[in-house]
Amino acid sequence: MCGIVGAIAQRDVAEILLEGLRRLEYRGYDSAGLAVVDAEGHMTRLRRLGKVQMLAQAAEEHPLHGGTGIAHTRWATHGEPSEANAHPHVSEHIVVVHNGIIENHEPLREALKARGYTFVSETDTEVIAHLVNWELKQGGTLREAVLRAIPQLRGAYGTVIMDTRHPDTLLAARSGSPLVIGLGMGENFIASDQLALLPVTRRFIFLEEGDIAEITRRSVNIFDNTGAEVKRQDIESNLQYDAGDKGIYRHYMQKEIYEQPNAIKNTLTGRISHGQVDLSELGPNADELLSKVEHIQILACGTSYNSGMVSRYWFESLAGIPCDVEIASEFRYRKSAVRRNSLMITLSQSGETADTLAGLRLSKELGYLGSLAICNVPGSSLVRESDLALMTNAGTEIGVASTKAFTTQLTVLLMLVAKLSRLKGLDASIEHDIVHGLQALPSRIEQMLSQDKRIELLAEDFSDKHHALFLGRGDQYPIALEGALKLKEISYIHAEAYAAGELKHGPLALIDADMPVIVVAPNNELLEKLKSNIEEVRARGGQLYVFADQDAGFVSNDNMHIIEMPHVEEVIAPIFYTVPLQLLAYHVALIKGTDVDQPRNLAKSVTVE
């Protein structure tokens, strides 16, 4: 979602700030701005509605000089997307950028108005600027003012503050929204994501919950919310910003779909040895913890929730471990009973998903056996706060609609299933079949991608559709959910997914010639049941699009289009059948002319509730 970049140096920092914002564009935003202060305290602020490129053009027309600055990309929560609502916000000499939501902004706004402050935006962020300004007027340093202001805020925030009268210092505070400090030589930086700072540093300090940081060119001092100084470890990051340009592809999403064979190879690298899954990266004590697991609770949101749903079938049928999957935003607000020796698994591409993080923190109070994060970003909050972590190693994913992060999550989950089956002493053939399937998976997906042109032609049938229904059975039901999510995310077609056995319990009422029905049909023990469901749709004139195993025995006719898929090992079928649904959504979105990589109203990483 929103992005923050800050810098304090002896050189001009405007281009550093702009490049940092460019690297955060993939998260989604509607406006951008920056403010730079020179050594004499002269501040220049630029804000623009739209893309960072528009802000960069404005900076070329009105050059910004100064060694201290903060910048921001905004995803609207309070107040419409507009230049007036774009950050940074100013209260006299106080300048603020902020990620998150201040839940008590309305009473604070009224109190500040009563003190004579005038608001020029609809945002909750302007409250922070005026509040810090007020506290500074009561006396003390900027740090002391921030320490008094922060306890008055309720909600989530990652905020960076500067005082134009003292351009040698930046103040930062975080609670529920990530901030990372980048360490340089005679210069320091701060951002909401380390990716933004990779061009200028590889040394980072990740702020923890409640931290307040005072940053100058030559020092970084960190305090807890009582004002006591604390030490935080600095780390050397080997994270790569490997998105590059789009190359031969029209969109990042298309590129990332085609990267999946190599992404899965990267996920598997170093993790299969002598026909077994090797997850020794979990550390020497992991086997002791995992061997005690009697139940698994998975928390996730969005696409990650769908991957968790697939893995539930695997954990139960292949490892014999009961598994529940819950949307993180639901889990955190209900009273739940914790089962004996239950392992908490959290799934997140970014590792900063607000509800998933909150669920993880809650689980530590509830008595779970331990926690394991599956994530694509090393050093993210989810990874740092979990007992164990497995990286998906998918590489940077730019498209808001997740593709390779989803399939690599499933790859990691399936490896974990194999390891647990071995620890439980189950038949060795289970792990053998999983390893064999995973090793074959990249080439199977490459085979499938060769059918892209056929799927592109198929997508033309959806150009005038307003609704779509996806069906699947067993572990393909969550793949139907994922297919529907992809279609609605990027084409803006209303799409729903159902377990095919539920047709007669409601969805059948929707079937007519204008309702496309997309079915995933691998050749497994549920195929005959699925064929009966397909006949129910055909009998009512529904238009069927069936992605079917080449040996499943389907024949195309007037209202049933069969897209034959190469036969794949049953254990990897859910991962495999995801890819044609990704391509279908992509081509439909192309035809409809939507913004594929940054669909309206959506953000890559949901860091607020």
Curated annotation (Swiss-Prot):
Reaction equation(s) it catalyzes: D-fructose 6-phosphate + L-glutamine = D-glucosamine 6-phosphate + L-glutamate
InterPro entries (alphabetical): GATase_2_dom, GFAT, GFAT_N, GlmS/AgaS_SIS, GlmS/FrlB_SIS, Ntn_hydrolases_N, SIS_dom, SIS_dom_sf
CDD domains to which the protein is assigned, alphabetical: GFAT, SIS_GlmS_GlmD_1, SIS_GlmS_GlmD_2
Gene3D superfamilies to which the protein is assigned, alphabetical: Glucose-6-phosphate isomerase like protein, domain 1, Glutamine Phosphoribosylpyrophosphate, subunit 1, domain 1
GO molecular function: carbohydrate derivative binding; glutamine-fructose-6-phosphate transaminase (isomerizing) activity
One Gene Ontology term from the biological process aspect of the record: carbohydrate metabolic process
Keywords: Aminotransferase, Cytoplasm, Glutamine amidotransferase, Repeat, Transferase
Enzyme Commission no: 2.6.1.16
Matches recorded under PANTHER family: GLUCOSAMINE--FRUCTOSE-6-PHOSPHATE AMINOTRANSFERASE, ISOMERIZING, GLUTAMINE--FRUCTOSE-6-PHOSPHATE TRANSAMINASE (ISOMERIZING)
Record's function text: Catalyzes the first step in hexosamine metabolism, converting fructose-6P into glucosamine-6P using glutamine as a nitrogen source.
Name of the protein in its database record: Glutamine--fructose-6-phosphate aminotransferase [isomerizing]
Organism of provenance: Salmonella typhimurium (strain LT2 / SGSC1412 / ATCC 700720)
